């Protein structure tokens, strides 16, 4: 076997399959594009689903890639096992209806064993296969130097996730030798394919050849697919470990440089103490995931991807604490991650200035979060005492763990000091529920969707002419599909999919909704209503139409757009470009578009940004867009190659993929973007631009909704009506007086609130005067014990504050019946002798409650206000008992 590092192994895989006619697909963003079923890209095939389900036909049916991926559904295993990671790379080769087993297996063997490539000794390789798939077994055994007896049948070697494509798979295992054997020879798992450390799975090849139809349970009865596919996956980290003879993935060149830096920062040594090794591994794994995710545009937050990043960062910080790293340190690991991955992912080092500030901010914020977690725990302990509870609920403990990053062990220790326990059974349930939610969010990876044979096989040419004209005469009907079948004609009343040889109808794409309109005869008679237009797999525009008259293949028709809708959508699309540029100019040049929706009545624009956009900034953005509308800038476009477009300064949409030829839309000298949609001819056509709202829709992603033209005018008229109504309520003579009237109203309200507080304080003082007159004695201590009903805790505290000022006794206990609940507060002037917390604990059972606090002040709550008198009466008994100790 050759001596190869991780970069060489990755590149050799890609080079090999490129030599076999495969196109190298670049590693795509970890943030899925147009796939809401996935939280992250979680496998090599995840970015290729559009090819396998037939929604897009690839330029080359042979594809290979090295795809960065994230999976967090087993996050708790990271650091405790040899090969669990949240971030990893998958090497893969794929065939979309092209080659199959007879090519895939010999190529796999060649890559693995040929001295020109990996050069692995054949005797170290073992193969598992599906028992009924004898073809696969025979193909492996026919390879040069294949060792007899190294094929093992496995009943679970059949890939099937429900209805849709399925098929047998074959796995390649590498024998690491007796040195790594962790089970006795007679253990049922001690074989290639079992759960052991000696035989390591390094490659899985799926033969997608059957169609799992609804109602079928026996895979031997699945029918063959018309297009058979190949999907393979080789985990880079695993393969590197065998080339470097490493005990686990963490002792390879992908991880060790990070571990060495953590050693330097902590003063600890990796490999010395098992628990500390877990922390080394967690930090090393998590910083890789966080670095790549932030580089791809994800940001920490409370939901979705943002929550995952925040959780990974917090886990890394907590494990840093376990290694006695007290200061922020994670940013120092980012350049090391970038250097390790530089050969294939140069963007990490290029994006350091974007990645490091995010981690720095989040790490600093987490220190405050830890403090907040401690405060919450204090509140929970206090509440438990009030409610006479003996436990902190598992739900609350999980909130401390999940939201504040507070370890369960720390919660248990703090609770024990307060005489409480933690409901760990309920905590475990909350943890399990969250893991199930995470797995659901990841979604079942459906490698291939149903293959729509009718659409995939459609190769008829169709040209979109809508950039230059809004109607077409003598368009020919090139294809008709009814009920998923190609037909020669369709009848009135049917819903059909139509393809024309040329069309002015824009197909929904890039956030812009599709055109609508009519199919007409030469005399203007409407033959069909077009309600939607989408891109077919072979890039034709496919029109969803409700037929009013019969239509047939070859028939000549006229195509007419709904011009009111088309013009409104085009104007709003131009407005999104103006808004995009205004955001870059006013806020920051590194803002990325994160999505958009262009409708006739309004537009929606999503963009990457931390935190809300201030109102003043939104005003500047709105003013700039309206200025460019007033400037009457011409809107033009050219078609050119992608490199020329970049030289022109055209902005690409973050995460989008482009072909060799691109369309660049320019709005004067103000904005240039890659774009395939329709636009106004001049910005003056927009008339007016008005922002309706700005909001957050996820971690680090903001959304602006806006209107233009007539919609903007209507909105302003509605605002004017509301303002007039407010003026009427406030008795304002002019609309301009409304703000001053509101300020007057607020000031009046504040004055009333002050008067209420003043009266409350006076009432408390009067109550204090009365109860301070009744000082009691018990043992050697003086005390006051009184009940004042309908008081809040704050009211009771004010009485205690007044008591401290007057120093009239050694102890005070005040109780109140507030809405059927009993409240007690106690304060001690001699906390070293009479602890307020102990007094409250002693008397609170009388009100069926519990409580506690500091030696100088404590409080309790209970559900039996009828017991207040008994509780107060028992104070003397408690104080007398102190003399006897």
Curated annotation (Swiss-Prot):
The keyword RNA-binding applies. This is Alanine--tRNA ligase. GO terms for cellular component: cytosol. Consists of three domains; the N-terminal catalytic domain, the editing domain and the C-terminal C-Ala domain. The editing domain removes incorrectly charged amino acids, while the C-Ala domain, along with tRNA(Ala), serves as a bridge to cooperatively bring together the editing and aminoacylation centers thus stimulating deacylation of misacylated tRNAs. Its main location: cytoplasm. GO terms for biological process: alanyl-tRNA aminoacylation. It catalyses: tRNA(Ala) + L-alanine + ATP = L-alanyl-tRNA(Ala) + AMP + diphosphate. Its EC number is 6.1.1.7. It is found in: Cytoplasm. One of its GO terms (molecular function) is transferase activity. It comes from Oenococcus oeni (strain ATCC BAA-331 / PSU-1). InterPro entries: aa-tRNA-synth_II/BPL/LPL, Ala-tRNA-lgiase_IIc, Ala-tRNA-ligase_IIc_anticod-bd, Ala-tRNA-synth_IIc_core, Ala-tRNA-synth_IIc_N, Ala-tRNA_ligase, Ala_tRNA_ligase_euk/bac, DHHA1_dom. Belongs to the class-II aminoacyl-tRNA synthetase family.
